[in-house]
Amino acid sequence: MFDVTPLENLFIEEYMLRAPGDFVKVYIYGLRLCYHPVEDATVPAISRALGLEEKTVLDAFAYWERVGVLRRIADNPPAYSFFNLKEAMLTGKAEG
């Protein structure tokens, strides 16, 4: 809880400013879970933590996948890999 989750300035400038607010919440919370895993990182758990409908959480992940900042790596249950945006921009490859 007292640790840090790095949020790239590139995300803020290129993606956050155009995204719906609830989708930004999902991205930042998901990024936090990448750096500080918890036992229950399911869509229902994320939904409860953020006070959002599960559909909103799933829509948010689908949105972020479409814009290219993460990718879905499993379907049941859904799991995602977040990209290093600077590396993806410099190399032209997105790797999570």
Please report, for each region that a protein language model flagged, where it lies by residue.
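Detector for short helical micro-motifs
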Residues: 12-53
